[in-house]
Amino acid sequence: MSWKAYVDDHLCCEIDGQNLTSAAILGHDGSVWAQSPNFPQFKPEENAGIVKDFEEPGHLAPTGLFLGGTKYMVIQGEPGVVIRGKKGTGGITIKKTGMALILGIYDEPMTPGQCNLVVERLGDYLIDQGY
């Protein structure tokens, strides 16, 4: 299965009648493995900040998480494993695997819990597969 198929079939799939607004699978170095068409264009320093927060949990808390110039307030995640952010009625979930970052961005009516489920389920699967 291609990485694009993982984005299309596992991240942008319908869950309880809702879908993520955008999603991507990135390498730890910021390389794009696959992304949905409307995934925000991000800067290398934004990816570096995300990776640093996984290495040093709490790094992004004072400044917020930026992706594509959009600022998300960092909310409770799982240190070193999952970063969660909130912006207005939407937010972001990022799951780290051994080789990749799985990102899902949502807006209402999708709930944070639904986004977490979609992103973390794929991340756990990829970890089990050695990624």
Curated annotation (Swiss-Prot):
GO terms for molecular function: actin monomer binding. Keywords: Actin-binding, Cytoplasm, Cytoskeleton. One of its GO terms (cellular component) is cell cortex. It holds the Pfam family Profilin. The keyword Cytoplasm applies. The keyword 4Fe-4S does not apply. It is found in: Cytoplasm, Cytoskeleton. InterPro entries: PFN, PFN_euk, PFN_sf. Occurs in many kinds of cells as a complex with monomeric actin in a 1:1 ratio. Belongs to the profilin family. Binds to actin and affects the structure of the cytoskeleton. At high concentrations, profilin prevents the polymerization of actin, whereas it enhances it at low concentrations. By binding to PIP2, it inhibits the formation of IP3 and DG. This is Profilin-3. The gene is PRO3.
